[in-house]
């Protein structure tokens, strides 16, 4: 049985009043993010910080009904805002 999912999943989450579409898939035992894009017309009015990325990861884990440890950390260069 393979635990690698080749299908990319898109999940929409809301963090700090902004809506984000997260593209990623499960690879091995963890869910990995490939791209995060901001949805909506409002420009982001603060920088992408490690704290913000942790909030995004927590919201993503909740949306996927997974433990936060099962979602890999999100790199800042994967976020389009």
Model-inferred region functions:
Residues 22-47:
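Intrinsically disordered, low-complexity regulatory segments enriched in Ser/Thr/Pro
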Residues 2-31:
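Amphipathic, interaction-prone secondary-structure segments
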Residues 7, 12, 38, 65-66:
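Residue-identity detector for glutamine
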Residues 39-81:
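Mixed-charge, Lys/Arg-enriched low-complexity segments
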């Amino acid at each position: 049985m393979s635990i690698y999912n080749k299908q990319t999943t898109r999940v929409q989450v809301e963090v700090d009043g902004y809506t984000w579409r997260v593209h990623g898939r499960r690879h091995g035992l963890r869910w990995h993010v490939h791209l995060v894009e901001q949805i909506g017309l409002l420009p982001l009015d603060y920088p992408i910080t490690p704290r913000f990325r942790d909030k995004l990861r927590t919201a993503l884990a909740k949306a996927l009904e997974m433990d936060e440890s099962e979602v890999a950390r999100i790199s800042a260069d994967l976020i389009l805002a």
